[in-house]
Design a protein with these regions (language model features):
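Catalytic toxin/effector domains delivered as secreted proteins or via bacterial secretion systems
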Residues: 3-144
Length: 144
């Protein structure tokens, strides 16, 4: 049984340029920009502040062999949830973000528009549950 990522996503963003064929760093920068990175690409741990929410944006190429299983997806995204959970404060040359600047945390997961298996969907659901236990919101965005 398969389902389209668009059916489980919270939103869809079209950026074109075959973003999913790019290398991971180039793809990450393009997706960061498209999803509203307002802290710069080198800011530690988080990518944007959005109305009091500290947001980390992560892209995951679900067509990669590593992410064929629920365990593969869960293990990768669990590390991202843990990193966001551990985030308290960070600074660069332009700004300092501390707990007074945010009241919630969110991991925004960017995925390609494709069919995924029930196994892959289970991996995403497992991550949502794990994040919920830590008080972190998960949103899934289809980027095409």
């Amino acid at each position: 049984v398969t389902t389209r990522t668009a059916k489980i996503a919270d939103r869809t963003v079209s950026i074109g340029g075959d973003v999913w064929k790019k290398g991971s760093f180039k793809r990450g920068d393009m997706i960061d920009d498209a999803l509203g990175n307002n802290l710069g690409h080198s800011f530690p741990k988080i990518d944007k502040l959005d109305n009091g929410v500290a947001v980390s944006i992560k892209s995951i190429k679900l067509s990669d062999k590593t992410y064929e299983t629920a365990k593969g997806i869960y293990n990768k995204l669990r590390r991202d949830v843990d990193a966001l959970d551990e985030f308290k404060e960070a600074a660069d040359k332009k700004r300092n973000i501390s707990p007074k600047d945010y009241s919630a945390k969110k991991l925004e997961i960017a995925v390609q528009d494709m069919k995924i298996t029930a196994e892959q969907q289970r991996g995403l659901e497992m991550v949502k549950e794990y994040a919920k236990e830590k008080g972190i919101e998960i949103s899934i965005t289809v980027v095409k």
